[in-house]
Curated annotation (Swiss-Prot):
This is Large ribosomal subunit protein uL23. NCBIfam families: PRK05738.2-4 (NF004363). GO terms for molecular function: rRNA binding; structural constituent of ribosome. Gene3D superfamilies: 3.30.70.330. Part of the 50S ribosomal subunit. Contacts protein L29, and trigger factor when it is bound to the ribosome. One of the early assembly proteins it binds 23S rRNA. One of the proteins that surrounds the polypeptide exit tunnel on the outside of the ribosome. Forms the main docking site for trigger factor binding to the ribosome. GO terms for cellular component: ribonucleoprotein complex; ribosome. Belongs to the universal ribosomal protein uL23 family. GO terms for biological process: translation. Pfam families: Ribosomal_L23 (PF00276). Keywords: Ribonucleoprotein, Ribosomal protein, RNA-binding, rRNA-binding.
């Protein structure tokens, strides 16, 4: 259960989603999760770890991208799965500890 969430994704876009409720009273948190995780398992894991009640969970499979390695060699980045956890505006998760 605890190993489903790998790490939080802290980017400019995820910070904007987390700090500014967009007209609605909801907060969005983005996590990198295991490939075999599903929505119900993620909701239960977030509930147990952070003691909050998620309203929704959205899952995105991020595909690998082409990258130039050394000289003329090409490679790919790894694919991963990320989850967007939706919370009520009254609840929050302290990600940066």
């Amino acid at each position: 259960m605890y190993s489903l969430l790998i790490e939080p994704i802290l980017t400019e876009k995820s910070n904007m989603l987390r700090t500014e409720p967009r007209g609605t009273e909801k907060r969005y948190y983005v996590f990198k999760v295991r490939q075999d995780a599903n929505k119900t398992e993620l909701k239960k894991a977030v509930e147990k770890i952070f003691n909050v009640h998620p309203l929704d969970c959205k899952i995105i499979n991020v595909k690998p991208k082409k990258k130039n390695r050394r000289m003329s060699r090409r490679g790919y980045t790894r694919s991963y799965k990320k989850a967007i956890i939706v919370l009520d505006g009254k609840e929050s998760i302290d990600i940066v500890k």
